[in-house]
Structures are given as structure tokens and as C-alpha cells.
Amino acid sequence: MNNRWILHAAFLLCFSTTALSINYKQLQLQERTNIRKCQELLEQLNGKINLTYRADFKIPMEMTEKMQKSYTAFAIQEMLQNVFLVFRNNFSSTGWNETIVVRLLDELHQQTVFLKTVLEEKQEERLTWEMSSTALHLKSYYWRVQRYLKLMKYNSYAWMVVRAEIFRNFLIIRRLTRNFQN
């Protein structure tokens, strides 16, 4: 019976040190630096704007509210993964420099892998996050972005609308990183 309590205490000790092991200050710095790089790359993707192609994809309002630190990290990871998937689509009609798009994809991939590694130890919280309404709204939002591109046959005007939307995403991610402060 005593061994059982010792085992419970050991598990609690193990989980509490795991929970404290994420350095949120470092995570904040890393994310801000990487998002700035992505914004700079996105700004280099030029094209013509046609206001008739405007769309409101309705980003979930929860994304602008304060969340607990680990949920913020999961939200950022979800956003980066989906932005990566958006830019993997057929962008050939845009006339964009393929090298810049590849660099953007590489930067997004590196950030996603970094966050996945950092958050690996938070599997229980990940399950809770994935079932949350915020996560579901976020998935639905990116589905609307993908659907818009597909309906518009990936034309250059639609891509410029999506480019502007993704730029807003990066601004939201930068704002979310403030949650990593004490």
C-alpha cells in the first residue's frame, strides 16, 4: 500500500517538473523572430488586388482573447500548420517567385516542428485543446480559406486576398505570443 503512494508521489513529481520545463520566454522570443521572418517573406509576394474578390473568412474571435500558455502554443501551432497547408496549394497562377514561397514554407515547417517538440510533453492538454470550441472554430476558418481558393480556381486575385488574410494571421500570432509573458 505504501509503495502505491510512493508511486503516485513519483508520478506527480514527474508531471510537475514536466509542466515547468517549457521556457515560455524563449518560446515567445523564438516565435516573434520567426513570425517576423514570415511576414517579411509574405510582403515580397506581390500581385494585383481586385476588390471584387474580397472575402471575410471570419477568424474566430477567441483567437484575440487571453488563453492559458499551453493553449496559446497549441493555437499558434495549429495556425502555422494550416498556413503551411494553404501555401502548399497551387500558387502557379500568381506569378510569385517560387524561391520565396519555398522559403516561407520552410520557415513555417521549422516553426511547426519546433512547437511540436516543445509541446510533446503536454499530450493531455493537447487532447483538451483539440476538443475545445476554439480549436474547432480555427479548423473551420482554415477550411473556409482553402475552399475560397478552390472555388476561385486559385487565381492570382484570390491569392492576394488570402495573402492579406495570412498576414493578419501573423499579426494575431504575434499578439498571442504576449500570453507567454508572466
Swiss-Prot record:
Modifications made to the protein after synthesis:
This beta interferon does not have a disulfide bond.
Where does the UniProt entry place glycosylation sites?
N50, N90, N97
Q: Which GO terms describe its biological process?
A: adaptive immune response; B cell proliferation; cellular response to dexamethasone stimulus; cellular response to dsRNA; cellular response to virus; defense response to bacterium; defense response to virus; humoral immune response
Q: Which residue windows are coiled coil?
A: none
Molecular function (GO) terms listed?
A: cytokine activity; type I interferon receptor binding
Q: Which GO terms describe its cellular component?
A: extracellular region; extracellular space
The record's listing under PROSITE patterns reads: INTERFERON_A_B_D
Swiss-Prot/TrEMBL keywords = Antiviral defense, Cytokine, Disulfide bond, Glycoprotein, Phosphoprotein, Secreted, Signal
* Phosphotyrosine: residues bearing it: Y24
Its domain of life reads Eukaryota
Deletion phenotype, per the entry, is: Mice show impaired antiviral activity and are highly susceptible to vaccinia virus infection. Mice show spontaneous neurodegeneration: mice display motor and cognitive learning impairments associated with alpha-synuclein-containing Lewy bodies in the brain, as well as a reduction in dopaminergic neurons and defective dopamine signaling in the nigrostriatal region. Mice also show defects in adaptive immunity: bone marrow cells display B-cells maturation defects, and bone marrow macrophages show impaired myelopoiesis and lipopolysaccharide (LPS)-inducible production of tumor necrosis factor.
Report disulfide bridges, numbered on this chain.
Answer: none
What the record says about family reads: Belongs to the alpha/beta interferon family.
Function statement:
Type I interferon cytokine that plays a key role in the innate immune response to infection, developing tumors and other inflammatory stimuli. Signals via binding to high-affinity (IFNAR2) and low-affinity (IFNAR1) heterodimeric receptor, activating the canonical Jak-STAT signaling pathway resulting in transcriptional activation or repression of interferon-regulated genes that encode the effectors of the interferon response, such as antiviral proteins, regulators of cell proliferation and differentiation, and immunoregulatory proteins.
Assembly, in brief, is:
Monomer.
Q: What is this protein called?
A: Interferon beta
Look up and give the organism this protein is from.
Mus musculus
